[in-house]
């Protein structure tokens, strides 16, 4: 198969040769490897890459992936990172408009206003920048003679991949991992990896989030050596019994192994003090080319997990051969909790759930959405310090470590799928869905269901996740209904959230478990709750903290005491989106917002809505948050 640039124009092509999404677990050959600072089965490709920038597809270096290609004219770029912040293209902030507004006329393929000219919409566009990356590497000795995969944790927005001159695959969905099998093409030494990243494809219609419009390889790139016997996917499902002191844990596994290989799975569960509290094992059975099995065992005494006491247990899955030899070990921390809805009220471990939350974009004043671990931990510390107990990952999945930090800190998570098509149905503030996507368009359906699938499969084991969110401001329709159906079929005990059923009440029963609104006034919340409400109420966005804001928070908080079905909400938002740059006159570092980069179209200072500045200094509004949220700890 050869790469086809026309895939950029086709919403039905969004993954080619990409491996199925799976759990985000780590794996090791033995317990000794778990103690090492670096996993010998992993090799990072982060660092300096060769790079060329092109203004569009036609100007790209077409054969740059060939092994004998002369890349002496290429520049150098650091991965992970945004291409714009490396000095290429234009830095641009937009809220709901698309980057092509005012320049080119685009409507989503197959929408009511489509022109029939979508065949070259992005592949032949005058403006659709391309980044061509080359990385040369040798395999580390520990990884040789094994199957090799590569994982791109985040690439905006569409990527083509080659290794040693051979086409490997294609992927969209900027914010979930894209994984490919390199085994047929890789060598021990002298490998040439080539990645071509396109700023826009049909995926752009689904990624119209309120943020700076960057592109490039902005999250980690890792080679993974896969043992002969390997846990491909694991689903931990710990449950807390009604007595709140005992529980069960189910572990569903899918394992790859040589044909005829006998493999057993052993579960060991330990508490925080490293005392063993449960153990069980099964022999895996062959099914559809894989080994599968489910361990289901009682845990006699457990401590419940919640925001007040985020108690985690250490689970270890050992894969063993017929002689008992350990072939692979998978560690994972899990918590026991019970989430339920009784008489239209949500309860966690038998107590009514109250959300004192924030929306949080991933952001660094220096590196944009390519954030570091120390910035994530600083955000967690800030939330704990200011009585924030929940976060909505607006409006895309975050980096994998964030979910582990939330598990550990007891921060409840609304895990949002990477979807927003705001600009297709709202124009100049008016709702006009004639060219909305995905809506009920069959050709877009699998693309958005795949995004839901990637979100669920990657993060399903995280105790902190209480809600799955179908996305943000993408109107309603059969395609979004199909996303909800996917989550419901998983029966994982979590609730599904989506706000835009408010726009089309024909779907209110089939795309959200909660009545969710943005910026509803307190009296509007009361009107709903006083008139035979069908569902519990959440404000997925409220208290828009732009400028001198947050003065009305106390009025909303009173609703928590007045109405059991009101569960609180998520402030918009946690952190300003602004970039540190040197002032042209003083030479000092200053924060610059939308519109400060001569970017048009732009929504200007609308990028600054945080309760912390982009450098993570708390704003005065945080005092209101700390006080009122603290009343409900």
Feature names for model-found ranges:
Residues 1-111, 192, 196, 272, ...:
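Accessory carbohydrate-binding/adhesion or oligomerization-edge regions at the termini
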Residues 3-16, 20-21, 35-36, 50-54, ...:
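Accessory beta-strand-rich segments of carbohydrate-active enzymes
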Residues 37-61, 78, 83-86, 128, ...:
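Substrate-binding clefts and catalytic carboxylate motifs of secreted carbohydrate-active enzymes
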Residues 143-146, 186-190, 299-314:
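Short glycine/proline/serine/threonine-rich loop/turn segments at secondary-structure transition edges
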Residues 161-163, 246-284, 293:
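Beta-strand-rich binding/interaction modules
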Residues 228-258, 624-633:
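Surface beta-strand/loop "capping" patches
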Residues 232-240, 247-250, 328, 382-385, ...:
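Active-site region of glycoside hydrolase catalytic domains
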């Amino acid at each position: 198969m050869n790469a086809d640039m026309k895939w950029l124009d086709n919403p039905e092509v969004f993954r080619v040769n990409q491996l199925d999404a799976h759990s985000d677990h780590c794996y090791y050959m033995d317990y000794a490897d778990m103690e090492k600072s670096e996993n010998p089965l992993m090799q990072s490709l982060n660092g300096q890459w060769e790079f060329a920038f092109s203004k569009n597809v036609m100007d790209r270096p077409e054969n740059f992936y060939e092994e004998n290609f002369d890349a002496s004219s290429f520049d150098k770029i650091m991965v992970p990172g945004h291409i714009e912040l490396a000095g290429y293209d234009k830095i641009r902030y937009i809220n709901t408009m698309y980057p092509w507004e005012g320049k080119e006329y685009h409507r989503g393929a197959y929408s009511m206003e489509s022109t029939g000219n979508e065949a070259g919409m992005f592949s032949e566009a005058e403006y659709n920048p391309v980044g061509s990356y080359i990385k040369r590497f040798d395999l580390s000795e520990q990884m040789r003679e094994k199957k090799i995969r590569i994982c791109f944790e985040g690439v905006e927005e569409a990527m083509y991949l080659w290794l040693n001159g051979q086409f490997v695959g294609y992927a969209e969905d900027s914010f979930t991992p894209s994984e490919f099998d390199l085994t047929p093409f890789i060598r021990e030494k002298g490998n040439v990896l080539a990645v071509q990243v396109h700023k826009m494809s049909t995926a752009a219609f689904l990624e119209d989030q309120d943020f700076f419009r960057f592109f490039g390889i902005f999250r980690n790139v890792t080679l993974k050596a896969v043992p002969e016997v390997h846990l491909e996917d694991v689903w931990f499902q710990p449950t807390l019994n009604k007595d709140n002191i005992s529980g069960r844990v189910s572990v569903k596994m899918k394992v790859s192994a040589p044909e005829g290989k006998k493999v057993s799975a052993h579960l060991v569960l330990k508490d925080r003090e490293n005392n063993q509290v449960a153990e069980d094992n099964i022999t895996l059975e062959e099914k559809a080319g894989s080994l599968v099995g489910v361990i289901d065992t009682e845990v006699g005494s457990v401590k419940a997990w919640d925001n007040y006491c985020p108690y985690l247990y250490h689970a270890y899955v050992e894969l063993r051969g017929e002689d008992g030899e350990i072939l692979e070990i998978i560690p994972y921390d899990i918590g026991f909790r019970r989430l339920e809805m009784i008489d239209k009220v949500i309860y966690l471990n038998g107590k009514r759930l109250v959300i004192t939350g924030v929306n949080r974009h991933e952001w660094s004043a220096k590196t944009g959405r390519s954030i570091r671990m120390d910035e994530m931990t600083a955000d967690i510390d800030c939330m704990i310090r200011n009585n924030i107990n929940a976060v909505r990952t607006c409006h895309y999945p975050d980096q994998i470590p964030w979910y582990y930090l939330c598990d550990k800190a007891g921060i409840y998570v609304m895990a949002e799928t990477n979807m927003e098509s705001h600009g297709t149905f709202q124009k100049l503030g008016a709702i006009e869905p004639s060219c909305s996507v995905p809506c009920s368009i069959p050709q877009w359906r699998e693309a958005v269901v795949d995004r839901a699938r990637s979100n669920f499969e990657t993060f399903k084991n995280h105790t902190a996740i209480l809600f799955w969110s179908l996305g943000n401001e993408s109107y309603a329709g059969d395609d979004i209904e199909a996303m909800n159906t996917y989550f419901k079929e998983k029966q994982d005990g979590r609730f599904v959230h989506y706000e835009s059923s408010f726009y089309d009440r024909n779907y209110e029963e089939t795309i959200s478990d909660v009545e969710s609104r943005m910026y509803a006034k307190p009296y509007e919340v009361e009107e709903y709750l006083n008139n035979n409400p069908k569902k519990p109420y959440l404000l997925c966005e409220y208290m828009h903290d732009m400028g001198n804001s947050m003065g009305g928070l106390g009025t909303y908080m009173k609703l928590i005491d007045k109405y059991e079905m009101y569960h609180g909400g998520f402030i918009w938002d946690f952190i300003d989106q602004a970039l540190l740059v040197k002032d042209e006159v003083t030479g000092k570092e200053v924060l610059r917002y939308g519109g400060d980069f001569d970017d048009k179209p732009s929504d200007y200072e609308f990028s600054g809505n945080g309760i912390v500045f982009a450098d993570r200094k708390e704003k005065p509004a945080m005092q209101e948050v700390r006080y009122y949220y603290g009343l409900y700890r």
